[in-house]
Each structure stands twice: as structure tokens, then as C-alpha cells.
Amino acid sequence: MIENIRIRNLRSIHDSGIIEFKPIMILLGANSSGKSTFLRSFPLFTQSVDKKLRGPISWFDSAYVDFGDYKTAKNRYADEKEGISFEYTYSDLVSIDRRRFYVRHGNYVYSTELKEGSFSFELKGDSKGTFISKISIHTVNVSFGLSVNDRNDNINFVINGISFKSPEKLFFNYNTAFGILPSIASNKSSNSDNDVSGYSLIYNRLIGILISVPLKSGPVKY
């Protein structure tokens, strides 16, 4: 369940602050304070996942909302280096498909590790359109960040505050199909069993953190 949301640099919203979701919500504010922008941000994502895109966001859809493009959607007072960002805090995440979290060698990942945390991403624009420049994921024991300065840059990985160096180039693939987040692609072409890929190193590092702190809730084996 999503507990709260924070929006930065979308139209008239420079920084919404943390907005907690309630069963009944009343938005109060002066004209052009961001009330309609906040409400329209939800169908913005609906129209973006309803179609195949060459990027993360569909800024315009005749059936939903029209934000124009990245340039017109960005807050005019935002710094040039800043992007449009969305941050969500979640709890009681019970819809995890456990089959997707297979851990090699019989290691265990504790259910509490994945059950609550926060997630955020930042959008930026260039001559080709809109792209995701930053993704951050925080769980009980893991802080995981991925970022690029340009859509074609190597991904910068930071795990619990420590930069991670991949042995090969890993970059975002923005050709999403009915989704918003990019996939991670590699320029690695060798299939040798002796090669250690960046995927494996990241995977092993994250799993090592997740299984290192036993919790009272007991382990879940994937």
C-alpha cells in the first residue's frame, strides 16, 4: 500500500512536501498552488502504462490529461539541473510475486526486508524526449540508487552509500512496453562461464545485505 507521495517540479508544484494518503482527502490552496496538478499526476501515469512508448511518460492523451511535454510540464522556477521527481513510501507490500525473487544456493531473504520502504525516480528531458535519470529504492537495510547524467551514460550504482563499479557498460533501455521504468541493458557479448557480469555482482551484493541481518519475522525462501 502506498502511504504517501512527494512531487517536485511538476507544473506549479515546486515541492509538495510529503502528502499522506487518507480514505478521504480535501485539497485546499490558492489558485495555481498545485491542487489540480497533484490530482492530474495520477492519470498521467495511467495513460503512460496503457500504451507502448519509447520513453517513460506520455505527457498527452486525449482521454486523460494534457501536460504538453517535458519542458512545459517542468516547474518554471526549478533549477536547470533539476528534474521532475516523484517519491512514494509504501508499507504492507503483500503483492510480491515470490517466484521473481529466486536466490541462489538456498539463501533466504526475510519478508520484512521487502515489505516496506520508499521508491523515487526523476525525469529529465533532452532533444529525444523524456528519460529517467535517477531511481532510488530504500528498504529496511538497503539503500540502492541508479543514476545517469545523460540518457546514453553508464549507470552509476550506489549501494548503501558506496559506489559500485561494473566490469562492463550497463545502461538504461528506455523502450518501455506498458511500463514506466527502464530496463537495464549491457554491452557484454561474451558468454564465457568464467566472466563475472555486472548483473551478478550487483545481485550478490544486494542479496548479501538482505540475508545478513536476521529478523524476528522469519525468513522467506525464494
Where do the PLM segments sit?
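P-loop NTPase switch/coupling surface
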Residues: 1-222
